[in-house]
Design a protein with these regions (language model features):
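Catalytic and substrate-binding clefts that recognize carbohydrates or anionic sugar/phosphate headgroups
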Residues: 81-224, 234-235, 240-241, 247-252
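A low-complexity, Ser/Thr/Gly/Pro-enriched, surface-exposed linker/loop concept
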Residues: 12, 44-84
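Aromatic- and carboxylate-enriched substrate-binding clefts and catalytic-loop regions
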Residues: 256-500
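A residue-level signal for conserved active-site and pocket-lining positions in enzyme catalytic cores
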Residues: 41, 152, 250, 300, ...
C-alpha cells in the first residue's frame, strides 16, 4: 500500500524564488486566434473560447489569478467566414457570430450545437446564466438551508461563462512598489483594462467541461493521505495535558484520527490589552494553556497526528506578540513606538516577515495552517482579494524546499487549494457536496454538527462548539453506546486505508 507523503518540518529561511514560479503556458496558440484591432477570439478547444475586447488594442498573454494555461497543444479545426461585417466562426461544437464592435448582446452570440433538450442553447453577450448548475460559495457562515452559489462551468443550457476581466496577473519581477521582491513572482493589476471572458460551450458533456477547466486553471494538487482521514476540531479552551489525554482516549475507544485542528485558543485571546484591540488575531502561544508548545506538537506527532493551527490574520502583528520586535523592524517600524504592523499583502516586506514568523512555528512542529479569513475581499491593490492572496502565497510557501504543499482555507474563487467551511446549521440541509468540482474544488471539507450514516462527504471534520457557544451542545461519545459519529469516523478511516 502506498504511504502518505511526508510534510517536512521547516526552518526559518529566505524564500527561494523557484518555489513561487508557476509552471504555465499562458499564451494562446497563434493558429487558434482570430483577431482584429481591438478584439481577439481564442479557440482553446472547439468548445472553450476566450473573448477579449481592448480599447487600447493591447491584449493579455500572461497568467492571471484564475487562468494559467491557454495553449492545450493542438490546433482547433474551424471555418471562418465574413458576411455583412460579421465574423462567423464554426467549430465542431459552436457557431460564433460577431460584429467586430465593442461586445454587445446584439453583436456577439454563440450557438452550442447538439443540445436538443433546451431552447436556450444560444448565448448572447451579457445573458444571465439561468441554467447554470453552480459551483460553491465563499462561506457557509450562518447558513441555514438554501444559499446563493457562484456559477460553475456546466449548465442545463449547454453553456457557461467565466469573466476574468478583473483578475490580476501573475508576473515575474524583482521589485514591487519600489521594494525588493524576494519571491520572484508577484500579483499585479492589469496595465490596461479589457473585457476577458471564457465561454464553455460543452453542451451536456459535463465531465469534459470540468476536465478542460482544470487544464485551463492548472492541475489538481494531490493531497497527502493523512488529509483524507478524520480531523478532530473543537472550539474549546483545551490545555496541553487535557488535549493529549483526549487523543489517548480516542485511541483507546478505537476512534481513528489523522489530524489535530487546534482552534484559536492556542494563542493569547482573553488577556490581550484592549488598547491593542481584540484577541481574535494572534501568533503567540497561550503559555497558561500550552506551557511547552514544541513538546506538545512533538507528542501529537508521536501519536501519529498532524497539526494545524487556526489563524485570523486581519489585525496584523501587534506589540503584544512575541514576534513583534523583529516584524516591526522588517517593515521599517521602531518597535518602541508599539505601532501596529498592518496586515498588508501588497507589501513584500510584510509578506516576507509574515512568512518567517510562520516558519519559526513550523520549525517547532506545526504542519500546516488553517487560514480563517472572514473580513471581506479588499486590499490596497485593485482587484486583489486578500483571501485569494493568502491561499496563493501560503500554498506555494508550504511547498518550499520540496515539501508536500498543503493549506487549509476558505474558498476565494475558482482554482485555489483545499477550502473549508464553517457550518452553523445542520449540514444535511445544504446539499452542496456534489457542486464544487465545477469550480475546481476536488476536495471539500465541512464541519458537521449532525452526523448521519448516509452522509458520505468528500471530507468530514468532526467538530464541537466551544463551551458556552450557541446552537449545539458538546456531544459526548460513550464507549458503550456507539454513535453515528463513531461509525462514520471508523468507516472513513477504512476508506482512506483502501486508497491506492
Amino acid at each position: 500500500m502506498a504511504q502518505s507523503p511526508q510534510l517536512k518540518q521547516s526552518s526559518p529561511t529566505s524564500p527561494d524564488p523557484q518555489d513561487f514560479r508557476l509552471d504555465a503556458t499562458p499564451a494562446m496558440r497563434a493558429d487558434n486566434v482570430v483577431s482584429g484591432e481591438h478584439w481577439r477570439i481564442g479557440l482553446i478547444t472547439d468548445s472553450l473560447v476566450r473573448f477579449e475586447w481592448s480599447d487600447s488594442g493591447v491584449f493579455e498573454n500572461r497568467p492571471t489569478q484564475t487562468v494559467l494555461n491557454r495553449d492545450f497543444g493542438s490546433p482547433v479545426e474551424r471555418r471562418v467566414t465574413e458576411r455583412d461585417g460579421r465574423v462567423i466562426i464554426d467549430t465542431a461544437a459552436l457557431t460564433i457570430v460577431y460584429d467586430q464592435q465593442p461586445f454587445s448582446k446584439e453583436g456577439l452570440s454563440v450557438v452550442v450545437k447538439g443540445v436538443a433538450d433546451t431552447q436556450f442553447n444560444t448565448w448572447h453577450y451579457g445573458d444571465a446564466q439561468r441554467g447554470n448548475l453552480k459551483g460553491t460559495a465563499r462561506t457557509l457562515d450562518e447558513a441555514d438551508g438554501a444559499i446563493e452559489l457562484d456559477n460553475g462551468v456546466i449548465s442545463r443550457d449547454g453553456w457557461a461563462v467565466i469573466d476574468d476581466s478583473a483578475a490580476n496577473i501573475i508576473i515575474e519581477t524583482d521589485t514591487v512598489n519600489g521594494k525588493a521582491n524576494p519571491f520572484g513572482t508577484w500579483v499585479s493589476p492589469r496595465a490596461t483594462a479589457e473585457t476577458d471572458l471564457y465561454f464553455f460551450g460543452y453542451g451536456h458533456r459535463y465531465i469534459e467541461a470540468v476536465r478542460d477547466f482544470y487544464r485551463l486553471t492548472g492541475p489538481t494538487p494531490l493531497l497527502p493521505r493523512f488529509a483524507m482521514g478524520n480531523w478532530w476540531s473543537r472550539y474549546y479552551r483545551y490545555t496541553q495535558d487535557g488535549y493529549l489525554a483526549l487523543m489517548d482516549r480516542f485511541k483507546r475507544e478505537g476512534i481513528p484520527f489523522t489530524t489535530s485542528v487546534i482552534d484559536m485558543d492556542w494563542h493569547r485571546v482573553d488577556d490581550v490589552d484592549p488598547k491593542y484591540g481584540s484577541g481574535w488575531t494572534g501568533y503567540s502561544w497561550n503559555r497558561e494553556l500550552f506551557p511547552d508548545p514544541p513538546a506538545f506538537l512533538a507528542d501529537l506527532h508521536r501519536r501519529g497526528l498532524r497539526t494545524t493551527l487556526n489563524v485570523h490574520p486581519r489585525d496584523g502583528v501587534r506589540a503584544f506578540e512575541d514576534a513583534y520586535p523583529e516584524v516591526a523592524k522588517r517593515v521599517g517600524i521602531d518597535p518602541a513606538t508599539e505601532e501596529n504592523v498592518e496586515f498588508d499583502l501588497t507589501n513584500p516586506d510584510f509578506v516576507d516577515a509574515y512568512f518567517d514568523m510562520h516558519h519559526r512555528m513550523e520549525a517547532e512542529g506545526v504542519d500546516f495552517w488553517w487560514l480563517d479569513w472572514q473580513q471581506g475581499g479588499v486590499t490596497r491593490q485593485k482587484g486583489l482579494d486578500p483571501l485569494w492572496m493568502l491561499n496563493h502565497m501560503h500554498y506555494l510557501d508550504s511547498g518550499r524546499g520540496g515539501n508536500w504543499p498543503l493549506t487549509f482555507s476558505r474558498y476565494a474563487g475558482p482554482g485555489p487549494p483545499l477550502p473549508g467551511r464553517l457550518l452553523r446549521r445542520h449540514d444535511r440541509d445544504l446539499g452542496i457536496a456534489r457542486l464544487p468540482a465545477a469550480v475546481h474544488r476536488h476536495r471539500f471539507q465541512h464541519r458537521v454538527w449532525l452526523v448521519e450514516p448516509r452522509h458520505r462527504r468528500p471530507h468530514v471534520r468532526l467538530p464541537q462548539r466551544r463551551a458556552g457557544g450557541p446552537l449545539v451542545p458538546a456531544r459526548r461519545v460513550q464507549p458503550d453506546q456507539p454513535t453515528a459519529f463513531v461509525q462514520l469516523a471508523v468507516l472513513r478511516q477504512g476508506a482512506v486505508e483502501l486508497q491506492p
